[in-house]
Amino acid sequence: MESLYELWGKRNPRWEEKYQDSVINVFADYGKGVNKYNEVKGKTFGAGYEVFILAFFIGLYSDQKKPLIEDASKVKQFGWAISNWGTQENRLGRTQYPRLREYVFAALVAKTDVDLIALDKGDVKPSKIVDQLMDSMEQYANFGFDFIKEKLEDDPNYFIKDTAFLRVFL
């Protein structure tokens, strides 16, 4: 039987497409693929899911969630399961970061109202628990995306400094 972590890792979180141009493409080379010939073009992150991770932590550390829009046609996925996040090496000296996935999962279990006793007793299916974890993850990230978007609208240079994202958490 697969663990909750393994089931969660097979998932691909959703995000609102309005953040693609306003946030994700500002900071990442989303949708371009990765190879050693890519130009960096001043992007802070490589893959779009890296911006998602940042947005998630902004929501988590702010203890704020924002539900995704109900219109499914305005919601997207990266097309890359969580278990694959941070597995690329050698892109501009990057190394893998599997522990970050573990920290995200642990935070979700800690902050999401899931009944692990009911799961252990077999009263609830693992997929239902994973659905709840994904919903929390998406809502935390959605708040974070909105936070980043608002900061950029107020001051397009807000995130230009090297410590800009760090300031968000301090």
Regions found by a protein language model. Give the residues of each.
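Charged, low-complexity intrinsically disordered terminal regions and linker tails
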Residues: M1-E39, K65-L170
